[in-house]
């Protein structure tokens, strides 16, 4: 089932690239303002929260499909997928902030 968004959380944003197939939804956000970190663990909390919100919303919009998120760092270019556990943790952090 889709993860719960924190009550009172307003999601306002625009997905840079959305790839939808019969089995999968891929959310890609381009990052142009800094070099890519070495791993997803180095991704800024704000980016984690942003992608977690997109992920949660699009899981509801596309039930039954795998939803994945990735950041495209344009300095490389480099495509970095964010693990589901990281997204769930970011949603928990948003819950405590609301």
What do these predicted regions represent?
Residues 1-98:
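Structural signature of nuclease core domains in nucleic-acid processing machines
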